[in-house]
C-alpha cells in the first residue's frame, strides 16, 4: 500500500496547538498571537489576537473558539462563526481558561477554568449558550484539575481530568465514573464522538483498563491491557491502542481484530478506517486496522 501526502502548509509557530474537526483544522500558536483555520488543502483564514493565546478549539460547523490572556480580566474567550465574525465573548475575571470545546451545532461552548483561593487551586467547568451572556450551567470540581471538555451527541458533555471522568446530559445532569481506585491516563474522542479512555489500574504504569463509550455516553465495552499505553485512538468502527511494542485494534464489541509489532519509538496512533497510523520522530507508519497482515502497510518519512 502507499500513503499519499494531501498537502503541506508551513507555519512558524513555536508552540503549535492543532485541533481538527470534520475536515477543518485550527492551528494556534500557544503563547503567541496568531491562529489559522485550514481545510485539507489550503489556509481558509488567518487571525491575530491582542493578547497571548492559551487554548483553542473548532466545532464541526466551523465555529472556532480562542482563549487568550485577559484584557482587564484573567482570561478572555472569543468565539467566531465560520465566516470569522465574532458571535460571543466572555471575560473570566479571576481564573485561567484551560480547555474549550464547541458543540456540533455551534451553539454551545464548554470551558474549563482553574483559579486559586486561600492558597488552594480549584477547577470548574462552565457551559455557555451563545444566546446568553452568562453561563447556563456550572460545575465545581474542587482541586481536581479538568484538562479536557468534549461535546458528544447534542449537549451531552464529557469532562475529564486525572481523577475525573464525568458525563453531563441536558446541561445539568452530571454522572461521575468512580475513579477512586484508578486514574485517567489517555483519552480519545472521534469525529463522530465515540470515546476511548485508558485508566491506570490502581495507579499502575503497566496495568491498564480500556473503556469505550458511544456518543450518548453509554459504555460499549471494557478490556484489560497488560502493558503501558502510549496512545489510544478511535473512529466510528475501531479502537486502537499503542504500547511500547504493539499496536492492538478492537471492534466496537471489544473483540481484538488485529495486532501488529511496532518499533519502540512510536509516539502516537491515529485510527482512520482501513488504516491506523503510528507517528514517530522520523516517520509515519500505516498498519491495517482489520488484519494482522504485514504486507498491507506503508511508511512516510519526514523528508518525503
Where are these regions (language model features)?
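Hydrophilic extracytoplasmic domains
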Residues: 205, 210-304
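Residue-level marker for isolated small/hydroxyl-bearing positions within beta-strands
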Residues: 28, 66-68, 111-112, 159-161, ...
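Structural motif
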Residues: 33-37, 72-78, 117-127, 163-169, ...
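A short beta-strand motif characteristic of beta-propeller blades
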Residues: 4-10, 41-48, 85-91, 133-140, ...
Amino acid at each position: 500500500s502507499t500513503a499519499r501526502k494531501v498537502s503541506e502548509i508551513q507555519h512558524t509557530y513555536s508552540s503549535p496547538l492543532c485541533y481538527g474537526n470534520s475536515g477543518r483544522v485550527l492551528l494556534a500558536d500557544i503563547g503567541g498571537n496568531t491562529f489559522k483555520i485550514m481545510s485539507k488543502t489550503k489556509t481558509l483564514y488567518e487571525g491575530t489576537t491582542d493578547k497571548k493565546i492559551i487554548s483553542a478549539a473548532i466545532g464541526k460547523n466551523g465555529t472556532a473558539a480562542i482563549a487568550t490572556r485577559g484584557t482587564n480580566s484573567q482570561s478572555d474567550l472569543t468565539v467566531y462563526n465560520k465566516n470569522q465574525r465574532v458571535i460571543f465573548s466572555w471575560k473570566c475575571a479571576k481564573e485561567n481558561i484551560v480547555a474549550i470545546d464547541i458543540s456540533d451545532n455551534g451553539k454551545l461552548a464548554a470551558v474549563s477554568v482553574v483559579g486559586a483561593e486561600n492558597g488552594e487551586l480549584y477547577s470548574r467547568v462552565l457551559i455557555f449558550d451563545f444566546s446568553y451572556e452568562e453561563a447556563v450551567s456550572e460545575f465545581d470540581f474542587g482541586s481536581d484539575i479538568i484538562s479536557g471538555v468534549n461535546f458528544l451527541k447534542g449537549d451531552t458533555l464529557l469532562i475529564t481530568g486525572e481523577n475525573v471522568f464525568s458525563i453531563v446530559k441536558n446541561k445539568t445532569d452530571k454522572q461521575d465514573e468512580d475513579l477512586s481506585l484508578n486514574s485517567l491516563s489517555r483519552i480519545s474522542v472521534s469525529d463522530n464522538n465515540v470515546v476511548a479512555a485508558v485508566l491506570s489500574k490502581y495507579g499502575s504504569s503497566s496495568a491498564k483498563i480500556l473503556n469505550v463509550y458511544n456518543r450518548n455516553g453509554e459504555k460499549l465495552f471494557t478490556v484489560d491491557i497488560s502493558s503501558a499505553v502510549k496512545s489510544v485512538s478511535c473512529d466510528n468502527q475501531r479502537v486502537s491502542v499503542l504500547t511500547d511494542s504493539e499496536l492492538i485494534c478492537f471492534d466496537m464489541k471489544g473483540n481484538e481484530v488485529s495486532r501488529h509489532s511496532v518499533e519502540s519509538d512510536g509516539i502516537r496512533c491515529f485510527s482512520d478506517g482501513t488504516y491506523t497510523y503510528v507517528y514517530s520522530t522520523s516517520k509515519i507508519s500505516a498498519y491495517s486496522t482489520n488484519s494482522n497482515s504485514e504486507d498491507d502497510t506503508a511508511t512516510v518519512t519526514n523528508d518525503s
